[in-house]
Amino acid sequence: MQVAYHWQVISRLLIALLRVYKLVISPLLGPRCRFAPSCSDYAMTAIGRFGPLRGSWLAARRLGRCHPFHPGGFDPVPDAPASPSPSSSCSCKGPHP
């Protein structure tokens, strides 16, 4: 339980830093992102959906694609995988309680 709380705190901290970037730094630089949603919006959604580790990895990959030689366009955050039901991972033939 304590570990999950720490990951949640880290996620909130990263999202807060991204919001500060959007409010303070981004207006000074002007719109530069080739994608929709913007890279900062993508990062906030990815961290909120997947947590700080995988969300940051997805955001870093997205930033790596954000350059003049990439066409850009619509690039949403992938959907979170559905949690498997207990019966889908079981190979037995009997009913489940």
From Swiss-Prot:
Keywords linked to the UniProt accession: Cell inner membrane, Cell membrane, Membrane
Region annotated Disordered, chain positions: 77-97
GO cellular component terms given for this protein: plasma membrane
The keyword Cell membrane is annotated on this UniProt entry: yes
The keyword ATP-binding appears for this protein: no
Protein location: Cell inner membrane
Membrane topology category: Peripheral membrane protein
Family per similarity comment: Belongs to the UPF0161 family.
Database matches in NCBIfam families: membrane protein insertion efficiency factor YidD (TIGR00278)
Descriptive protein name: Putative membrane protein insertion efficiency factor
